[in-house]
């Protein structure tokens, strides 16, 4: 049996609140807003030495070497999204939930499990 490679890692999971409802209202506008939010979020994750290893529609999962870095990235991107939402009409303000977890993970190629 192949030996499993493990390491201690901090995982940040972000998800857009009520994304399906926004898609029901206007798919194209929602996708434009999502892309704009990702243009804010992705560089901030990179700035704090995070690595996005999974995305699915309206979610982003990133790995960080440090819990402090992941929290700082989450705070900065939430503040940036809040600032962005000041100029967006109320019915299309995308809000993001963020969870952070520190644990032993299993590494398989570029993906992480656990």
Model feature map: region roles:
Residues 39-42, 61-114:
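Catalytic beta-strand-to-alpha-helix segment of the class III nucleotidyl cyclase homology domain
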